């Protein structure tokens, strides 16, 4: 029997909570009220594959990136005590989808937010060749204008023949986006290292009504000459987009400021 997919929620001063997937139909029926993200003027978002915190200097870089950042979308985030302390001290809630444990702390996507989500749907897809899982997380947050912002944090499958499994991982995300009427941010490490994968990703984004954030000076990490990390959006305006060059991971973090 396959393992049930769930998220772990980390909140300062509270026990770790296990969250099971929410159904997309909940998005149509209305979500509970909650405190909005502090986004009166700008919404600052950081997206970073943190490489399981294996390189020196990751924590100082993370702390600097976290300044005035309302949403931080991490991939390959391993729930070490250092990361959990940072997350709970700096953010209202941190939700992680454990993809697998190495060796004792789960690793997967983690979304850190300056407000508690009113909806949470963890997703996982197994790598067909390595039999390891990649994870994604859908969360929804109120923003100051009364709308609900959907945030999708993804680490896409890497090793597969063709794009069938790649597209299969995107399909349930598309269902979630289609059920949501407000603004959306879809971001993460898409492992889009082939022309087939980029085509599949672009078609998916187009079908979902999403635009791609463009970087004027593009220092995104690449494989076979193609960028791996992307940010897509709808219902928001991009004010600034940049990439920080760092040796603290094998990926460079993306930083975007939106106007809600």
Swiss-Prot record:
Pfam families in the record: Exo_endo_phos (PF03372)
Q: Which GO terms describe its cellular component?
A: cytoplasm
Report the subcellular localization.
Cytoplasm
Recorded GO molecular functions are: catalytic activity
Q: Which UniProt keywords apply?
A: Cytoplasm
Nucleotide-binding as UniProt keyword? no
Question: InterPro entries recorded for this chain?
Answer: Endo/exonu/phosph_ase_sf (IPR036691), Endo/exonuclease/phosphatase (IPR005135), UPF0294 (IPR022958)
Family recorded in the similarity comment: Belongs to the UPF0294 family.
**What is the protein's name according to its record?**
UPF0294 protein YPO1077/y3099/YP_2772
Q: Which organism is it from?
A: Yersinia pestis
């Amino acid at each position: 029997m396959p393992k049930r997919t769930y998220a772990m929620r980390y909140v300062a001063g509270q026990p770790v909570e296990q969250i099971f997937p929410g159904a997309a139909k909940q998005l149509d029926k209305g979500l509970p009220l909650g405190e909005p993200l502090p986004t009166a003027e700008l919404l600052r978002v950081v997206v970073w594959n943190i490489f399981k915190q294996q390189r020196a200097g990751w924590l100082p870089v993370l702390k600097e990136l976290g300044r005035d950042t309302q949403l931080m979308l991490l991939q390959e985030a391993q729930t070490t005590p250092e990361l959990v302390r940072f997350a709970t001290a700096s953010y209202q809630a941190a939700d992680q989808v454990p993809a697998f444990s190495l060796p004792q702390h789960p690793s997967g996507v983690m979304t850190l937010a300056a407000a508690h989500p009113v909806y949470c749907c963890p997703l996982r897809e197994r790598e067909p060749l390595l039999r390891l899982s990649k994870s994604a997380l859908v969360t929804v947050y109120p923003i100051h204008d009364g709308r609900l912002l959907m945030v999708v944090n993804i680490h896409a499958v890497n090793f597969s023949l063709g794009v069938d499994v790649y597209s299969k991982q995107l399909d349930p995300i598309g269902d979630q986006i289609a059920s949501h009427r407000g603004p959306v941010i879809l971001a993460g490490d898409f492992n889009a290292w082939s022309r087939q994968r980029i085509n599949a990703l672009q078609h998916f984004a187009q079908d979902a009504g999403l635009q791609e954030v463009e970087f004027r000076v593009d220092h995104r990490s690449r494989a076979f000459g193609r960028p791996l990390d992307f940010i897509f959006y709808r219902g928001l305006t991009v004010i600034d987009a940049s990439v920080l060059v760092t040796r603290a991971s094998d990926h460079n973090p993306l930083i975007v400021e939106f106007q809600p």
